[in-house]
Amino acid sequence: MRTITKIGLIIICTYNVTVAQSQQVAIELTMVFDIPYIGPINRIEKITFGPNMRHSIENSKSERFYARLFVNKSKGKIIDINSHNFWKYDIEDKEYWVVPFEKALYKQDTTETKKEDSGKKRSSWSTTIGDDDNTLEGVSRVENYDVILLGKQSKKWVTTFTSANGRRLVLEEWSVPELPQLRLADSLNRALELELGRPDSVITPLGRGFSNMMLTIENIPHELEPIPGEIIKAVIKSYGDDDDEPNFSMKLEITKLISEALELRHFLVPNNYKKVTK
């Protein structure tokens, strides 16, 4: 019986690998940031995942003139571990350049430095929730069924983190039942990141959700269960003490999710782009 079980597991694993190698998944992620003094920033990111390959295209636009000078960008990035190629390109200028593949690899020796730098750059709402000087007074959640997303009935979850100084972090998240396409994209992305040397513990799963990640922090006491399914839409709002309007907001949503047969041309720089040196 054990031999039969082992053979069955081998067959299943082989099938999953074969499917992943012959498929690609395209995701479109829309993001809107509303930042004080800068205003709304709209960003659309299209990512195509393949076996040990990833092609991301980013378009960012700002509504305010002075912010447009720095934010408005259309660019792409392709990583292909199979051929050890790393390209970046500018969509508006129709130019591309080769990046040394070593720059795509995860550098373990800079982890501590990155942690320190990220801690300095993070917003106050992400650094003070649950800190010793600003203890968390409570975590609450309400839920109800909501709109159809990606053809699935969604469920809306509103999780509120309230700190001792009156600040609130409100996470609105919409979940749907498990999506095979998103699971495949997550599997392909995880395999690529592992090949690049990134530890499994720091790879963020696709569709996991912000509140699920925050509730794993040790100094945040709660009795909430993780949100089940795939979280494909989220609105994050940060409020100051007694503020009715958020001082920061961010909206993210997976608007397209397509699984199709692998086409290698989707992981190449457009042939009408000019090669430059940077």
Tell where the protein language model's regions lie, with residue ranges.
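Sec-dependent signal peptide recognition
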Residues: 2-10
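Generic hydrophobic/packing signal
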Residues: 6, 15-16, 145, 173
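Hydrophobic h-region of N-terminal signal peptides that target proteins for export
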Residues: 10-20
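Extended soluble regions of mature proteins
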Residues: 23-278
